[in-house]
Amino acid sequence: MPIAVPTPTPIPVPADLGVFLTSDKTAYEENSTVAFSVYYNNKLGTPAEKVVVKAEIPQNTTVVDAAKGTVSGNTISWDIGSLNGKATGEIIFKIKLGALSASEVNMSSKATISSANQMTKTDDDESIFNFMGFSKKIAGKPHTKFINGYENKQFRPENMITRAEVAKILVTALSLAKAKDTGKKFKDVDNKHWAYDYIVTAVNSGIFSGYNDGTFLPNKAITRAELSTALAKYLKLKNIEPVKVHFKDINTHWAKNFIEEIYRSKLIAGYSDGSFKPDAQIKRSECVTIICRLLNRGPLKDADCGFVDVNKTHWAYGYIAEGSLDHSYTRNSDGSETKKK
């Protein structure tokens, strides 16, 4: 009798794919069109088979351009097929917001990627982009200031901002509940430091941390990388390898992943020479602008911020006014605000 030859068990072929979803801004008026870009890639050198990219769109939106994808309910699917090793791709699709029943509505869209191969390192197989829809027809809640000036009516927009100052701004702007003193101490911040409660709250909330030597360095100017990391942690963005690196000077930087996530979220941009300058210090004018973007606030028009060292021609005037004044406002079509008289 012939000897039966066992059928060999197929060895699963791994696939390591990534997807990156973004848009050109974070606030859109009701009944307007939103364009999303989906970037995807194959990180391995071998092909991935039966690759599918999907995008989930928010409720109260309709698909305007599915980019040759298949629409089913609130999901668009693209059958990519075989994706060669190290290959990349981009899909641009468009949706339209419906009429809103509130002045501001938080929304999000999600992109995912899958394959018939055995997926590995799946943290970057989905990407979420958060944005705000707004209506000019409905009054929004008044905005509360989150940053103060100095004596003699100065704002000092070109001064570098310290880690302690940013801790206070974030705790104030994000309305973080004051944390109990858990006993975690920094050897350079005692309970008599003016920002002690803010630092403790920011650290306990997980958005700030100290250094390996047990210091916090409250008076050190914060860097672009440090602020990017703090914002990413607040937004609970993933510390994952990006599908695409957009800046020439961050490839080996410790904060590369968070920098790319914050860039994807349209909170901090790079420079015209293709750099991000991760270790550059941040000015007060830059910081207030970034926090306003995080909150989808401003810039504020028709407002006098009252600072003698901030001319109305200053590039950040509207954001400085937004962050330093308690005010009621009407929203404009471009997302900016006009202060009510």
Locations of the language-model features?
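Short glycine/proline-rich, acidic loop/turn segments that cap or connect secondary-structure elements
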Residues: 261, 288-297
